[in-house]
Amino acid sequence: MFRSRSWFGGPWGGRPKNRLSLEHLKYLYSILEKNTTVSESNRGLLVESLRCIAEILIWGDQHDSLVFDFFLEKNMLSYFLHIMRQKSGGSSFVCVQLLQTLNILFENIRNETSLYYLLSNNHVNSIMVHKFDFSDEDVMGYYILFLKTLSLKLNTHTIHFFYNEHTNDFPLYTEAIKFFNHPESMVRIAVRTISLNVYKVQNPSMLRFIRDKTAAPYFSNLVWFIGKHILELDTCVRTDIDHQSNQKLSNLVAEHLDHLHYLSDILLLEIKDLNAVLTEHLLHKLFVPLYIFSLTPAPPPPSLAVVTQNLAAVLNRNVDIDIQEMHNPRVSSIVALFLLSLVFLVVSHAPLVHALAWVILNGDHSVFKEGAAEILNSYVEHREVVVPGFGEPDESLEQALDTVTGQSSSSSYALSEDSGVESSSPATTELDSQADAVEAEQIKLRNITDEEKQLLQKSSSSTKADFAEMAKPFLDTVLHALDCTENDYLALLSLCLIYAMSHNRGIKNEWFEQVLAKSTRGAFSYKTALIEHLLNIITQSSQPSSRIRLITVEIALELLVTFTRPSSDDSRCITAAQQDLLFSARNQSMVVIRNFYKSEDIFLDLFEDEYNEMRKAQLNVEFLCMDSTILLPPTGTPLTGINFTRRLPCGEVEKARRAIRVYFLLRRTCQKFLNEKESLLPLTNVVNLVQVENVLDLNNSDLIACTVVAKDSSKQRRFLVIDALQLILVEPDAKLLGWGVAKFVGFLQDVEVQGDKDDSRCLHITVHRGGVTHNRTPLLSAKFLFDDHIRCMAAKQRLTKGRSKARQKKMYQIAQLIEIPGQMDSPVYAVGGTMVASSSGGSGNSSGSSSRSSHHRPMFSTANRVPGFAAVLRGSNSAGVSRTQMAPNRSIEGIRNESAGRSRRRSPSSTSGSNLRADHSDRERSPSVSMGSHSSSQSRENSQPRSTGNRSRESSPRMPRPRSEEIPLEDFQHSRNNSPHSRGNPSPASRSHTPIRVLHYDQLSGHSGSPREASLGGTNALLSQLNGLNREVLPTQSSEETSFIGSDGNEATGGSEGRRRGAIETV
């Protein structure tokens, strides 16, 4: 009734209260003594006892040495072994706990003496060789984990506990490698870890045992296992044409990469004898008979080969046709190129990669009989000759290891004998199987006619001549794969192989280029042929309908730079004709971009985004070859999840992206050939931008006070400043009067402004992230509250116009980059219907003046400035930015004020001709008004077809101004150059993106009370200079216009003495 519920209840009650103590271990030992036989009734008790013993031993390792003394004194490991060997019910359940206990014990022991105690009585080796029931997944998992934990404890001192030199017994290694081909991937990974931990121990006798007893059978079985895996991979590629088995193919590629990295790790340990054996097996049992053999053309049907062989016997001619080769396993050329690329990308062991590269670059069909002995002899001394052949070993690894353990120490598993048997016995069997077929075909040959004999003789001789001419058949196959007439399916993998060979550390670059440069066919050079193939790919990629992926173009350009790189004394190894082809491809790519320049609304965002992506993404061919999708035919749908650069474009937007990226890649390559540095990209000069927390001089700048209400209803008082390219929210500096700290900065081109229906003082402003990005979260999305609706409207107007101007400026920069006709010399790029011709007759028009006129009106002038526009601070000799437009309904007073202000701010560094400047200065000094009246009348007559009647600004519709009427600006010089934090090192002047012929002006003045010139003749001369023709302006009926720079209504007299700063005037 009151029986204890614990595992230790019953007759063995009275356990110690302290769970981690020597007394508790003695108590657990008494339980093991009384439960030597495992049954269903006591297996739970035994499991709990084993778990507690492990805890006490780990505690005693760090706190009480008497615990281990008692454990060894009672030889408690023998009880563990006794429990394992029982076949009674529940033993498998207890074995799992035993293996887990041992694993925890060896994993957590830190004291070397305690470890030596545990390993000294050889019970651990007995546990390793015990025949567990590996059909139980738990037993298998804990057993391999136990072996892995022990391998981590291996070093030069502990190796003697595991390897017995007298008996040539090494159970930790031999038992582990038996599971190298286990179906569970975690088990295979653990086996590789165990073997590498064993190889790392530099013990000569142990390494000699591995080389003599286990290396050949292990590596031969491992190579065969990898080969079978490759055949499965090839089957998956052949059947998965529609990208339906992507996950399976990805797993197969990942598994093969694990194999390659494992082999590379073994070779990097630089164990000379072990590497020699592994290199022989890899080269002659896998790479040459399977990879290289798959690069050869598909053989004829066996029946035709037998007929040809028999005909040769009748005609007494020698035709070299190997019947066995026709039945050798092979993979598709796609898979062969992919696998060879992986070898050169992962493995860098010089004897192996050099021999394999020599076979590809210099080898012919004789390599399938002789192997790569010529190259390997220079690396390996006393090397046995091995005939290449891909086949299953005669013995499984488990059988071979059992045989080795039963043999005496003098026996040796000879590599040459093993290799000879593996390669010769399949051949003998194959020849015997073909003997009857040969005899049957000989009977048929007696009945063929003379004409048939002649045809067969010609075919056999031509085949022989073709093989003789193809001195380097494998290299020719690689180069022929670069043909991109249909698509770049084969070309991409061929480029990956060439790139991997040219960048492998085990292959000397000088030798690689020497082999390509020489040839036996006269003046023909494989290097020249390779460069021509690369240029063909580049030329085809710049066509509008090209089916070449971006990654192919990038690798081709990288290889072109690599193979034309100048040596120390010579110039680039490229002819003028080849260089012209490259530049022609760049020009063609610009032609393709021009088709998208006006057709895509988001062209500017695409352009900037592709440039940023190209700068961030560095070419990594090894990472590319980890992607299994390059093994499948190129697809154009994004539904497969394939990266954009590794598939064909889908839709007009992606076609535009591809065209832009191709142009960027070609432009960068051409600049490398010309030794030029990029000076026009990126479109935005980051150096001259305002950054967050910059301290800005806000004196003489227009600010609009506002309250920013965020999504979480938090409110912040800020001042809105609008620059040429940026929207800036500033907070006044607490220490310096008239200075502010930038708290938020965003590009005007990414601003979206919406008014509030309920509140005329409110604007909803969203600043999006620049470019086409997956992160759709905006940089700022908030409600802006202004003091009154006038300031709200002013802010909206400035933001809208600023966004338009910023985007137009960058679009003009792009037009300069891609050399759109009509955009190279003038910033005015025509839009249909916006340019009209002026009358040829009329006084005041000189013969050299332009025949085209357009209407302009001032955008960023100070004559009728609205609060919110960030006036450029006056600096020493720093160029400002001004855009000028003239509208036919502007008042004469506004024109007078504007012209007077601009005449004072005219820059002496203007690029206009000297004659034009002299003419302008003469007209400014002339007080005549009659000429202005006549010119204005002429201008008004010319503009009659465009405007009918006089309408006020409020009543006229707000039509968007055409692009052709705009003059792009220079970048503003930021006022942070005058900051006290940066006075010591002023930043350089902002880079100008405007063309040469654009007029330059000094910075706009922030003061509204400066004296004004009232000369109408000077106004007309300035406006006619800006418009490129001599025109005269007459006063027209003006519309009402509100100005924030204050004058009372005495403006009509032309005097400025009646002006009062701060008042609002209506003109």
Curated annotation (Swiss-Prot):
Protein name: Protein CLEC16A homolog
Organism: Drosophila melanogaster (Fruit fly)
Main location, first listed in the record: membrane
Polar residues bias: start-end ranges: 421-432, 876-888, 975-993
Pfam families in UniProt: CLEC16A_C, FPL
Subcellular location: Cytoplasmic vesicle, Autophagosome membrane; Late endosome membrane; Golgi apparatus membrane
Function noted in UniProt: Required for mitophagy, autophagy and endosome maturation, possibly by acting in multiple membrane trafficking pathways. Required for endosome trafficking and maturation. Functions with the class C Vps-HOPS complex member Vps16a to promote endosomal maturation into degradative late endosomes and lysosomes. In response to starvation, functions at an early stage of autophagy to promote autophagosome growth and efficient autophagy. Essential for the recruitment of lva-positive Golgi elements to autophagosomes.
InterPro entries, A to Z: CLEC16A/TT9, CLEC16A/TT9_C, CLEC16A/TT9_N
Residues covered by the FPL domain: 50-199
Protein's membrane topology: Single-pass membrane protein
Gene from which the chain derives: ema
